[in-house]
Amino acid sequence: MRSLIGMTFLNSSVGQRRLRQNGIVLRLGPVVADRRRATLPHRQGHCLDRQDLETLLLWLQRHFLCVPLEHLLEGPAPTCLRIALSVDGNPAELAELVYPLLERYEMPASAFIGGDPRSWREAVAETLWQADATAAGPLLELLEGYSGAALMAVFERTGDDQRRSRNLDLLLRKLERLDPASQQALHAACPVPAPYSAGDWERVRRLENSGLLRFGLRGQEPPPSAGLCAEDCLGRAHRQLQQHCVAPLPVFCQARTTPAAQPGLRAALGRLGYRFAFGARNGLVDTRCDPLDLPRIEVDAAIAARPGRLAWRIYRGARP
């Protein structure tokens, strides 16, 4: 029913008029090579497999003009329905799994690099799933007080990935009841992703040179103190992006758990030339939006597999 309502709105004159006055930016989760990995219970559908991504791109082509992100943010185009894509993933995933489909269907996209993109839930899940006792040591010490004997059943590798993933999902749901400070402490105890290698930056340059992918700066998760982020972390990541990209986007993407850019961060973004920033809100971009707290629409595996559900999300975002 929701898909039917969404498609009716999308194809109606009222819906078309409303959407021409707005911009739609989709945030696509990381793309993995096979459906089995994407559908493990503890991933909660945040990953997309290649087949679902292709299904989504074909649907978008039928209903929208896919434009570069910076073109969409400059203002409305009353003659057509426009949409822009932002994709998550490291340079290898983008080059091997995402770019070939963007090239096939001639659809531009943006990606944000810099800070750790993982939420506390994703960081804890990934650390436990890897089952590396040395790397996970600090996290295991914190978790022992929350989960008891159930923890080792989750941490130990078994031949039954589905069962282990279900147990991990149950543990994560229990941890969701913790206060935000405790959740951020869990995140801080997880191993930090390795910095980009020379090979990663070479992939970034090749992707940018293709003309289909442009790169912007991503905020840190968990967010450091406002002063540190604005004056140290942000500036260092900005210089690295400027060094390795020919035309980096003047767009900043905040950590997903950060509500809106604080005054110190806003000032730093202005000094560094960032005119736009995405916050944590879901919705459509219009002229009334705060340019440093822009919304996007999250696309998970369920929506990518059945894009009619995206029409419902768009309908909800377009309602006054």
Can you say where each PLM-predicted feature lies in the sequence?
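Glycine-rich active-site/cofactor-binding loop and its immediate structural neighborhood
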Residues: 84-88, 94-97, 103, 108
